[in-house]
Amino acid sequence: MMLIPTHHFRNIERKPEYLQPEKCVPPPYPGPVGTMWFIRDGCGIACAIVTWFLVLYAEFVVLFVMLIPSRDYVYSIINGIVFNLLAFLALASHCRAMLTDPGAVPKGNATKEFIESLQLKPGQVVYKCPKCCSIKPDRAHHCSVCKRCIRKMDHHCPWVNNCVGENNQKYFVLFTMYIALISLHALIMVGFHFLHCFEEDWTKCSSFSPPTTVILLILLCFEGLLFLIFTSVMFGTQVHSICTDETGIEQLKKEERRWAKKTKWMNMKAVFGHPFSLGWASPFATPDQGKADPYQYVV
């Protein structure tokens, strides 16, 4: 008697009723091309608003408390241009990280027709998520906030109200880098401004009253120090994750490595684009994946 080749399914909840592909409905209509990705999560939206508010607060203090009242016009112009450029790039990176599809797996694609179209060999394993009824590529994980399986998911970040995954990791790294830079720049300017005010008359070093000036500068100093530490750690963690080609979830779960090992430089190019260029530092340049290997549906 001839045996019919079968394929093995694995799901994250071990529920037998989910193992039948017929249980899944056809995937919904994906919508028009270019539809904006946005997660409707109250906590994430609030965190994103707070992020913008803190950056704009820093802009206000830097411009109206320190730079505009300064008599050194060259100092004010140079630092104003640098700080505003970094702040603009930080907010642009935040928008791209928040509004870019991080790599969502098509929802409801675990249908009999789709599974047959994969042309799987006998004995091959496919991963199926019962929560969104999707066939998951290798290294994809389900996000309970986004309610989707995300390819190469690192973590869900409420500050960008999105998952950090295959398609938006570059923008998240740039966001942490530029926030760290403007925090460091703001702290340096606060230090110089305090020295200037101690040497001169406090009533002449700011257009605000001395008590108001001190309060605004102390708040900015606290904000800058907090964000400098936080984003520097996140930036270093992300760069290390990229170089080792191991996401935060994979490190946490200590998952077995089933993908080909590549050099650190190739891993960097896979995230930031091929080849190396100034576009790596631009949130407006979409990474060109070049010859980067796609993450397959089977292992």
UniProtKB/Swiss-Prot annotation:
Entry membrane topology: Multi-pass membrane protein
Subcellular location: Golgi apparatus membrane
Reactions catalysed: L-cysteinyl-[protein] + hexadecanoyl-CoA = S-hexadecanoyl-L-cysteinyl-[protein] + CoA; L-cysteinyl-[protein] + tetradecanoyl-CoA = S-tetradecanoyl-L-cysteinyl-[protein] + CoA; L-cysteinyl-[protein] + octadecanoyl-CoA = S-octadecanoyl-L-cysteinyl-[protein] + CoA
Family of this protein: Belongs to the DHHC palmitoyltransferase family.
GO cellular component terms given for this protein: endoplasmic reticulum; Golgi apparatus; Golgi membrane; membrane
Residue list for modification Phosphotyrosine: 18
Signal peptide range in chain numbering: none
UniProt comment concerning the protein's domains: The DHHC domain is required for palmitoyltransferase activity.
Protein known as: Palmitoyltransferase ZDHHC3
Residue ranges that the UniProt entry lists as topological domain Cytoplasmic: 1-47, 94-171, 236-299
Extracellular-facing ranges: 69-72, 193-214
Active site: 157
Post-translational modification: Autopalmitoylated. Phosphorylation by FGFR1 and SRC probably regulates the palmitoyltransferase activity.
Subunit composition and interactions: Monomer. Homooligomers. The monomeric form has a higher catalytic activity. Forms heterooligomers with ZDHHC7. Interacts with TNFRSF10A.
Keyword Membrane: yes
Function: Golgi-localized palmitoyltransferase that catalyzes the addition of palmitate onto various protein substrates. Has no stringent fatty acid selectivity and in addition to palmitate can also transfer onto target proteins myristate from tetradecanoyl-CoA and stearate from octadecanoyl-CoA. Plays an important role in G protein-coupled receptor signaling pathways involving GNAQ and potentially other heterotrimeric G proteins by regulating their dynamic association with the plasma membrane. May also function as a calcium transporter.
Lipidated residue numbers (S-palmitoyl cysteine): 146
Effect recorded for residue 155 to A: Probable loss of protein-cysteine S-palmitoyltransferase activity. Loss of function in the TRAIL-activated apoptotic signaling pathway
Keyword terms of this UniProt record: Acyltransferase, Golgi apparatus, Lipoprotein, Membrane, Palmitate, Phosphoprotein, Transferase, Transmembrane, Transmembrane helix
